[in-house]
């Protein structure tokens, strides 16, 4: 309870995304709050669990188990009125030699689920659409043309329809996407307007975005904030592609 109270609420009162960021804290946000990735520790986040499906809505399974994905939508800077980053995470191995000793492995209590943060996607390079509103399915299309289909898996104790927030997100992110302090959305490979890129690089994901011309997603090795050098809205990224 104390952790949730210490997290900031979404403060951009004029933003249409304010409601979704004032929802309860999810497991990915709780994990990031512990400080592994400093840039995301206090960032407002909206997240949901999904299963990956095919275009026809069939569940894509691995070893007879549904492929679970946690999708987090993040606003990384207070100067932005709209979210700018999508995070993807998956369940990690709960116990291994590096994390758990023999004493831990012998306990009968169920271990807490650990998420592995696997991808950082600037939202200006992701097109999110509703694939099937009745079945609560999303279609994610990356700048390279690669597509993914996801079906919402709301918690059993959910007190509201979480898919409404995703529908709202789709609406507010429709082009032109003004997620970077008034700059317009640009597609990967469109590098003719250097002034636009200069403005975009002022956002926390500016360094990461330069890789989007050739890569549609990033594997995060390490993220840390260098506040003394760049100030409160500039971040130093180390990203493994």
Curated annotation (Swiss-Prot):
Similarity-based family: Belongs to the GARIN family.
Alphabetical list of InterPro entries matching this protein: GARIL-like_Rab2B-bd
Domain of life assignment: Eukaryota
Pfam family, one: GARIL_Rab2_bd
This protein's name: Golgi-associated RAB2 interactor protein 6
PANTHER family: GOLGI-ASSOCIATED RAB2 INTERACTOR PROTEIN 6 (PTHR22574:SF11), PTHR22574
Organism from which the protein derives: Macaca fascicularis (Crab-eating macaque)
Gene Ontology terms: cellular component: nucleus
Chain's gene name: GARIN6
